[in-house]
Amino acid sequence: TVKEGAAAAGLGRRSLIKRSLGAALGLVGLTPLLLLRDLGPLPKDDFSKTSWEAGTRLVTDPGDRPIKPSDLEIGAVAQVLPELPNGKVRKLEDIGKDAVLLIRIRPEEFQLDAERLSWTHEGIIAFSKICSHMGCAVALYEQQTKHLLCPCHQSTFDVTRAAKVIFGPSARPLPQLALALDSDGYLVAKQPFTEPVGPSFWERDSA
């Protein structure tokens, strides 16, 4: 079943972050994600193109299990990746670009405009895990304040306000991934990211 698969992948209720103290998210086996520049050159054109497309299912990382809204309780946060086509092998550089944080709060806690609110689903919101300052992994979540924190330079983002920067050197919010449900009730991307993923200091074309 879906819940059995989710539990096996580490997305079961006991494994989700439910305490108010920040905790590291999904970093086991992903140490290179902490500073993406250590992976080697990441040209702007390659970095800005992620694997997310309209209709791509969100899957657990680790585990590659598709996710339904019922798998996430209020206060939960999980790292997810785009589902791979059959036979395709996930590359480390793709994980660096594609990693997303999935967070569930009470819908009434959002302070979003109509468009951004339409990108959420029943209190579930998704952001790129890659800090928009220097490309580190945003790895801490404080449940009471609904803040995400990058441990490298302490950039802090408000989940309720579309990951608006409220502290630290980052110049822009974390890109938000629009969510929807497919015909089987699994969470999918409504569309690709509408803004570049990754550090602001790299110049990119807006297209």
Language model features with spans:
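Short linker/helix segments within small regulatory modules
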Residues: 142-145, 169-170
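N-terminal twin-arginine translocation
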Residues: 9-47
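N-terminal pre-ligand scaffold of iron-sulfur
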Residues: 1, 38-130, 136-141, 181-207
